[in-house]
Amino acid sequence: MIKLINQLKPDYDYIIIDCPAGIEQGFKNAIAAAKRAIVVTTPEVSAIRDADRIIGILNANEIPRIDLVVNRVRQDMVKRGEMMPVEDVVEILGVNHIGSVYDDENIVIASNRGTPIATKNCVAGRAYDHIAMRIC
């Protein structure tokens, strides 16, 4: 992976690698050359535990910058106390929060139609745009 990244560096400002779920060899290969990691989690207890483990591994591998995106947030469930608020997730994980994506049926519709969500006038599409601006 390090060799591949070094070959790509001269031609690209950003190289994004989508890691497989879990912490197996695919994950370890993906972070081998990382200078930054963006951990994406949902506000569910099991997902937050997994994200915390991932952040620990990233820290142990001396990844200099770790950011967080909280995905599939449902404000109605947060208000009823059925889902953890984003602020609590950020506090538990203790890394820089660069954005949240609220659950949006337009994501499913766009995915099924094969259309880009970023072109949609929807909450999730705007969230993606904001997160992209914070990455750059």
Per-region residue spans from a language model:
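Conserved catalytic-core segment of NTP-binding enzymes
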Residues: 2-10, 14-103, 109
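Residue-level detector of flexible, active-site-proximal loop/helix-junction positions
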Residues: 104-105, 114
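C-terminal boundary of histidine-terminating zinc-finger modules
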Residues: 111-126
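C-terminal alpha-helix
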Residues: 127-135
